[in-house]
Structures are given as structure tokens and as C-alpha cells.
Amino acid sequence: MNRYPKRDDLRAMSGYHSPQVSVPVRLNTNESPIEPPAEFVRDLAAAVGDIRWNRYPDRAARELRSAIAALHQVRPENVFVANGSNEVLQSVLLAYGGAGRTVATFEPTYQLHSHIARIAGSTVVNGNRNADFTLSEDEVRRVLTDHQPSVTFLCSPNNPTGLAEDPALIASTVATAPGVVVVDEAYAQFSPHSALPLVNDDSRVAVSRTFSKTWSMAAARLGYLIGPTWMIEDLDVVALPYHLDALKQVAGITALRYVSHMERGVAGVVAERERLLSEMRTMPLTVWPSQANFILFRPDSTGGAQSGGARSDGARSDGARSDGARSDGGAAGGAAGEIGRRVWQHLLDNGVLVRDCSSWEGLAGCLR
């Protein structure tokens, strides 16, 4: 095969793809279990009939941006829309990352932050979370001071661990970061607070959101960012012409007419999350608290349930230490990983697909 090699810095990378398996219960990608209302489907079908398919869509997606702006009480000039929040993140990294620039994440966290950063040619530096997966201001300050990142990602609630970041920590990060701070809020509606109040034209912070989780629209691949006007202008520079098709635009506009349905759905998911957390804490599992629409847990070989994953000495079965450093725990991590894989397979054999989180550092044997 006369194959031409890809870039040297991409040779060790593989694609980021979640399994798609036909099973009765699919939980591995945190999609909404709730279908959109029938009225939404009806209204969208009518709106699709008005699309002029022989013409390019509105390049600026003005009506959609205005509708999102009204939802968050900002100006349309503070809104950037794209094909899922992943394209939002890619646009940020094309604008502010790249060769000679550094991107900071705090592991374990959403893997596409570092994945897209590397594709964009950025150098990625990883800070550490505490043993309970919270993030300390000292660690954030160390990473910002030592590495001077052009882009700093905070995921709140954090995927895959489930906790929202402390609002005071987010504010202090924004105040001290040398570059832009992106708060990934794909699951924000399930949590008690948001970083949106920090966004203004004098700040270097932006908040990314998605229609995939709370709006029951994962099939549409629609996301957006709320940021200062100068950042939206920069993102428009790197966006491809007519990048958001007409169908996505009308789907988003139509969905935003059903805010109350979305909010009821979120409330139902939160209630079910709390019920499930309560039940899981009676089982032989290590279970972490969640402020998202998923729960991180590790099957416990000792047969005793734990909450939060941290014992009084700060140790965990994956080898995490109370100082926030992590390893896969050597033999203990290998044993935990094997137990986790067996439970994952057992669930799959019974029609339930969950996420095996062992590929994240420090999450050997964990499932989500």
C-alpha cells in the first residue's frame, strides 16, 4: 500500500470513539434517557419544510444565537455555535492553542480536551486532582505558574468523576490564568451552579454548553459557547464557512421553545440519580458523589460499600495518595481493573452498556 504518513506528532494517537452497541440500556455516553416532546418533533418537521435546501444556511446563525442569548440573558455577540460542544472546543484550540502554546487540564477529566489540543499542535500539561477528585487552588496555581498555559480547561461537573468545581476555585483560576479559561459545562443543568456569571467582555473566561445531554438532542450534534465578544470574533475567524447547517439551526431554535420540558426532565434525572446513589451505597461498591447525570463507581473486591472512594488516610485502591499524586496502583490497580472488566462484561451480557473508565489515569477498575 502506497500510504503517505501522517504528522509525526499524531503517530502515537488513536481516534476517540465510544462503543456503539445495540443493547436495551445504553449508558456509556451519558445521553438523555428522555425523548423530546412530541410537540417538538411536530414543530421541527414543520420548520424543516420551510428550509430552502438549494441555498446555504445563515452563516452567522443569527436567529439561533439570539435565542441562546435570550436564554442566558446575554447578547447574541456573546454566543458562538458549532457542531456539538466538541467543535466549540476545537475552535477554541485552533484560535488560542497550536504550536509553541500550552494547554492545561486537570486529570482525570474529559479526554477530548487534551486529545483535540494535541491535534491542534499544542503542548499539553496535566495537573492532578486530589484523592477525592476535587481540585485544590494550590495545584491550579502551580500549573498556571509553572507552565503559563494559553488555554486552561475546567470541566464542571467534571467528566468522568461527576463533581462540579468550587465556584471560588473557578473565579480564582480566571483571575490568575495567563491565557483563556474554558469551563466545560456539558452537564451544568444537573449541578447547583455555573460559571456563566463570570463571563464579561473584560474577562478571559468562556463557558461551553451542549444540546446533547439536557435537551435530549444528542443526534443533532449542536453546541455553543458563551464568551466575551472579542473571543467570539476570534472563533469566527477559525470557523469554516457555513459550518452550521440549516437543519441544526432550526432544531436548536425549536428546542429553545421547550425550556420547561427540559427543566422537568433534568429534575427527573437528578431525582433518579439520588435514588440510584442511595441504592448503590448499600452494595459492595466504591461510589463517588455526582452532580451530573452519571455516577462513577468501582466494584469493591472486599465486599464492603464505600462512599466517595477515600478512606481516612486518603488512600484508594487505585494507588492514589492524599497529596493528589496518582498511579494505577501496581498489582492493586491491576486487580481492580480485572474486577471492573468482569463487572462491565456481566452488565453488557445482561443488556446494559456502561463506560469502562480504566483508560483514565487513576481510575483502574472504575465504571461510569
Kindly give the residue locations of the regions a language model identified.
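Conserved PLP-binding catalytic core of the aspartate aminotransferase-like
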Residues: 270, 280-304, 332-350, 367
